[in-house]
Design a protein with these regions (language model features):
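Macrodomain-like recognition of ADP-ribose-binding/processing modules
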Residues: 1-123
Length: 123
């Protein structure tokens, strides 16, 4: 995966195998991109809340969600902040990106669409 292209558009319309959801570590998907994921993937949201309750979602730890339907997109949940009311920090983004680079091949990710990290509701 060495080709990076910047595109403007709706991440949910992406033709990529995997799409990235920017999340916090407290179990809230209340605005922006995360809210879009919560509405489209309610079963993932329920697991996310449970993982947060059990302190399994942390900065630098990525969670790949795959729906049982084979033709469905994969969602890479990427923590960009600890709490929804605090901004993202550059070191949080770097930790997540480093983990992505280290693990995308073993996870089977062949193509991916990222939203802008740490901006809008994240910034």
């Amino acid at each position: 995966m060495s080709n990076i292209t910047f595109k403007k558009g709706n991440i949910f319309s992406s033709d990529k195998q995997t799409i990235v959801n920017t999340i916090n570590c407290v179990g809230v998907m209340g605005k922006g991109v995360a809210l879009g994921f919560r509405l489209r993937y309610p079963e993932m949201y329920e697991k996310y809340k449970e993982f947060c309750k059990n302190k399994q979602i942390t900065i630098g730890k990525l969670w790949l969600y795959k729906r049982p339907q084979e033709d469905s997109k994969w969602v890479l949940n990427f923590p960009t902040k600890f709490h929804w009311k605090y901004p993202s920090k550059m070191e949080y983004l770097e930790a997540g990106l480093q983990k992505f680079v280290e693990t995308y091949q073993e996870k089977g990710i062949t193509s991916i669409a990222f939203p802008l990290l740490g901006t809008h509701n994240g910034g």
